[in-house]
Amino acid sequence: MEPTTEIQATEDLTLSGDHAAASADSLVVDNANDNAGQEEGFEIVLKDDETAPKQDPAKNAEFARRRIERKRQRELEQQMEAVKRGELPESLRVNPDLPPQPDINAYLSEEGLAKYDYDNSRALAAFNAANTEWLMKAQDARSNAVAEQGRKTQEFTQQSAQYVEAARKHYDAAEKLNIPDYQEKEDAFMQLVPPAVGADIMRLFPEKSAALMYHLGANPEKARQLLAMDGQSALIELTRLSERLTLKPRGKQISSAPPADQPITGDVSAANKDAIRKQMDAAASKGDVETYRKLKAKLKGIR
């Protein structure tokens, strides 16, 4: 199947060492909430990009109808519910650190009895004393393990709740964007990275996680470069990339050229239109789809 969405980079992504970032393609995002006006959808692009090619609206409309599956959100919810039921993964299990249990043969053997002048009663008394001490230490170890198990479980549950909420916001944002083949690109990205990486991106970049995963899924070489970095360097690159990704309305170009002159006529409506357009551009740059659409409706009302 020929992809209908791409992401475009206008500069090399700076990487640590000798890593040179690959330039990205352009990404087109369809506005599926307005099937009658596919030309008025959105594109996710990197700032300063001016060369994003237009896509076939009919194909975009077809892909836009695909439902985002919220896979990672469901996985996180299922993991949290399993832990609440007591079904703990190995990573959460805490085993008691038990001391070695006394061996009666060490007391009643020829060598052991020699320590007690071959007196069986003395040897048995020594064994019973050692075993009683072991039972007390074992009980303490088990109590400590239970306490640590409870602490780890509570910590996991609290952290899981944060990840589930981050995943919910992530998919809510993805659905608002209505990226035609979003699920395909997210799946491609998730196959490249450990599950924890995707969850961390959702948590650390709540406003741009959907765009980041789409971009990296469409450009797997960038995802591989990030995986090759240490954690701090990868976080810096992800932050830089998130700042460059932006929305732009379909059919328009984001330009670094100075803004057009303000209307110099006495037409108040013309000035209002210009102000609303600027607000629309600002909302698009922030990825605020809801505000953009409200302003767009307001602009139509002035016309």
UniProtKB/Swiss-Prot annotation:
InterPro entries: Phage_P22_Gp8_scaffold, Virus_scaffolding_prot_C. The keyword Transferase does not apply. It comes from the Viruses. Keywords: Late protein. Induction: The scaffolding protein negatively regulates its own synthesis when it is not assembled into proheads. Residues 1-74 are annotated as: Post-transcriptional autoregulatory domain. Pfam families: Phage-scaffold. Residues 275-303 are annotated as: Interaction with the capsid protein. Signal peptide: none annotated. Required for procapsid assembly. The interior of the prohead is filled with the scaffolding protein. The scaffolding protein is lost from the structure during packaging. Scaffolding protein exit is followed by the expansion of the procapsid into a mature capsid. Homodimer. Homotetramer. Interacts with the portal protein; this interaction initiates procapsid assembly, thereby ensuring incorporation of only one portal ring per capsid. Interacts (via C-terminus) with the capsid protein; this interaction allow to form the procapsid, in which the scaffolding protein forms an internal shell in the icosahedrally arranged capsid protein subunits. This is Scaffolding protein. It comes from Salmonella phage P22 (Bacteriophage P22). The gene is 8.
